[in-house]
């Protein structure tokens, strides 16, 4: 914990030497939404990430920023569970419809859209909105969980464990119509999705991954191959044949809980700091990042203020490295090296010394 906070402070201290030229136009959308699951507090994730210095960090990287603020979602007073199990379906459906409109507007305006969650059910809206302008997009899903249960296979009833099932075309004959979900148009196919960091996959999800040949890299795969090879294979799969926009959906619980304790479903044995930032640095290097979700930061689940701040600060590092922050430090964009003001300056200095 203390080590991760120190690393973050070191990176932050290097930023004043960062790029002096703007390289990205970034829209920031706060999505303070928690009804994709049952734990309170994840709706405060956007505020925590902002307070950790996100906008300042992006600005120091030279990004042009359009801040959409934090969205205010429609309240649904009577939202009975679907099938006596799936909670808050109408709230989730309506909120994602509203979010999709904002993401669509940001992307159509030429911005790379960063959505701050909020729980991971929000990916229904972010990917849907993104796909309206980039129907050929691909998705890199960094998470401890596969989040591909259907409303008929879920055990928890939480929609934050189901978002991808509503988006994948080939799954639609297995997905019932939930109230509030009629607006969704499935926009993904299995070859356009890669998972990184899985370590808590339910039996039905594993069946889906295998049946539809969805590429995934579990933590065991990362241990076996190394994160460099994982990223090489990810890019070969998604952008090897043709370049297309990347949607990065990053759940903070992909990291080991020692680094990101303030989250709702932590699982031991997660990504290290170096592995997590290598993922985002490599995605940035493609020049194809078009939208990014950073979800599941829950300050209320921290056991101390330091844990809450460390988790939010880690989220900022993930986003900043997606837009050009490098661990070797920032680099001023030099056009030329300075020269002495006159050709005799060195001779004059020598005379003074004599």
Swiss-Prot record:
Any one cellular component term from GO for this entry? cytoplasm
| Lineage: superkingdom | Eukaryota
Q: Which InterPro entries match?
A: Arginase, Ureohydrolase, Ureohydrolase_dom_sf, Ureohydrolase_Mn_BS
- Transit peptide range is 1-22
Q: Which GO terms describe its molecular function?
A: arginase activity; manganese ion binding; nitric-oxide synthase binding
Binding residues for Mn(2+) 1: 120, 143, 147, 251
Q: Where does substrate bind?
A: 145-149, 156-158, 202, 265, 296
Residues annotated as binding Mn(2+) 2 are 143, 145, 251, 253
Where does it live in the cell?
A: Mitochondrion
Listed under catalytic activity are: L-arginine + H2O = urea + L-ornithine
Root EC class:
hydrolase
Q: Describe cofactor binding as the record notes it.
A: Binds 2 manganese ions per subunit.
Q: What is its EC number?
A: 3.5.3.1
Q: In which pathway does it act?
A: Nitrogen metabolism; urea cycle; L-ornithine and urea from L-arginine: step 1/1
Per UniProt, the keywords (alphabetical) are: Adaptive immunity, Arginine metabolism, Hydrolase, Immunity, Innate immunity, Manganese, Metal-binding, Mitochondrion, Transit peptide, Urea cycle
What is any one GO biological process for this UniProt entry?
positive regulation of cellular senescence
Per its UniProt record, the required cofactor names are:
Mn(2+)
A Pfam short name: Arginase
Keyword Ligase present in the record's keywords: the answer is no
Q: What family is this protein classified in?
A: Belongs to the arginase family.
What do we know about how this protein assembles, alone or with others?
Homotrimer.
Briefly state the protein's biological role: May play a role in the regulation of extra-urea cycle arginine metabolism and also in down-regulation of nitric oxide synthesis. Extrahepatic arginase functions to regulate L-arginine bioavailability to nitric oxid synthase (NOS). Arginine metabolism is a critical regulator of innate and adaptive immune responses. Seems to be involved in negative regulation of the survival capacity of activated T cells. May suppress inflammation-related signaling in asthmatic airway epithelium. May play a role in promoting prenatal immune suppression.
Q: Under what name is this protein listed?
A: Arginase-2, mitochondrial
Q: Which organism is it from?
A: Rattus norvegicus (Rat)
Q: What is the lineage of its organism?
A: Eukaryota, Metazoa, Chordata, Craniata, Vertebrata
């Amino acid at each position: 914990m203390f080590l991760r906070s120190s690393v973050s402070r070191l990176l932050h201290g290097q930023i004043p030497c960062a790029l002096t030229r703007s390289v990205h136009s970034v829209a920031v959308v706060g999505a303070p939404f928690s009804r994709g699951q049952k734990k309170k507090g994840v709706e405060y994730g956007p505020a925590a990430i902002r307070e950790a210095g996100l906008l300042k960090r992006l600005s120091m990287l030279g990004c042009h920023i359009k801040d959409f603020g934090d969205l205010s979602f429609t309240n649904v007073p009577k939202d009975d569970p679907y099938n006596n199990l799936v909670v808050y379906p109408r709230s989730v459906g309506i909120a994602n419809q509203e979010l999709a409109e904002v993401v669509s507007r940001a992307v159509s305006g030429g911005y790379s859209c960063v959505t701050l969650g909020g729980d991971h059910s929000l990916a229904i809206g972010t990917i849907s909105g993104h796909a309206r302008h980039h129907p050929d997009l691909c998705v890199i899903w960094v998470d401890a969980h596969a989040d591909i249960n259907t409303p008929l296979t879920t055990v928890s009833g939480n929609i934050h464990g189901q978002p991808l099932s509503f988006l994948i075309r080939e799954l639609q004959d297995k997905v019932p119509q939930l109230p509030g979900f009629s607006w969704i148009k499935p926009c993904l196919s299995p070859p356009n999705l890669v998972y990184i960091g899985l370590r808590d996959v339910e039996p039905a999800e594993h069946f889906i991954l295998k049946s539809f040949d969805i590429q995934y890299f579990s933590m065991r795969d990362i241990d076996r191959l190394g994160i460099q090879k994982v990223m090489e294979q990810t890019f070969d799969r998604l952008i090897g044949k043709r370049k297309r926009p990347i949607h990065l959906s990053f759940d903070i619980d992909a990291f080991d809980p020692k680094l990101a304790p303030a989250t709702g479903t932590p699982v031991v044995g997660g990504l290290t700091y170096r592995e997590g930032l290598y993922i985002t640095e490599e995605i940035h290097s493609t020049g194809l990042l078009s939208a990014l979700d950073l979800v599941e930061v829950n300050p209320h689940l921290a056991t101390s203020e330091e844990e809450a701040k460390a988790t939010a600060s880690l989220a900022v590092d993930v986003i900043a490295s997606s837009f050009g922050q490098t661990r070797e430090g920032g680099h001023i964009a030099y056009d030329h090296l300075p020269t002495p003001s006159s050709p005799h300056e060195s001779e004059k200095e020598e005379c003074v010394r004599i």
